[in-house]
């Protein structure tokens, strides 16, 4: 993406979804730093790694999502994979690197209904979001 941006400019940017990097073993926070200024949209989506299944088999998962109890990783409701400290760091880093857009909740947690998952995600974000930023000199 960055090479493409070098070639054509800021016409193109990233729809950043941290959950994919999580299950691949990457670090979304490092990626945010590398993509500074190129993040145009952000998904608020979490992933839980189940070490009982991932340690002996790795993270490359071939079981269908509906077999979530047997999988090495699953998409989960916000806060059910990574806690509030991680998500605070994520949101703060997005702001520090110039992102001031929305966080779009993407619910794919099969352990609860979509309505409950979205409600829990909204409640979670409401608890950790910074609402008032002081004026900077």
Which role fits each region the language model picked out?
Residues 104-114:
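A short, acidic, flexible beta-alpha connecting loop/helix-capping segment that sits on the rim
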Residues 1-80, 136:
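Acidic/histidine-rich catalytic cores of soluble enzymes
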Residues 106-107, 134-137:
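Short, flexible loop/turn segments with low-complexity composition
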Residues 41, 101-102:
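Residues at the N-termini of beta-strands
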Residues 92, 97, 113, 117, ...:
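Substrate-binding clefts and catalytic carboxylate motifs of secreted carbohydrate-active enzymes
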Residues 114-134:
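C-terminal helical cap(s) of enzyme catalytic domains, especially alpha/beta-barrels
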Residues 8, 89-100, 131-132:
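A structural motif corresponding to the C-terminal end of an alpha-helix
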Residues 1-4, 31, 86-93, 120-125:
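A general structural detector for well-ordered alpha-helical segments in enzyme core domains, enriched
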């Amino acid at each position: 993406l960055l090479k493409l941006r070098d070639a054509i400019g800021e016409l193109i940017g990233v729809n950043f979804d941290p959950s994919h990097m999580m299950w691949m073993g990457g670090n979304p926070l490092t990626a945010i730093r590398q993509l500074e200024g190129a993040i145009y949209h952000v998904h608020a989506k979490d992933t839980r790694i189940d070490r009982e299944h991932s340690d002996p088999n790795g993270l490359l998962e071939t079981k269908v999502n509906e077999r979530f109890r047997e999988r090495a990783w699953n998409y989960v409701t916000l806060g059910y994979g990574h806690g509030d400290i991680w998500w605070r760091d994520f949101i703060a880093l997005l702001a520090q690197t110039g992102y001031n857009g929305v966080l779009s909740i993407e619910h794919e947690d099969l352990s609860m209904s979509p309505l409950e998952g979205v409600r829990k995600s909204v409640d979670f974000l409401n608890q950790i979001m910074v609402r008032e930023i002081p004026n900077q000199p």
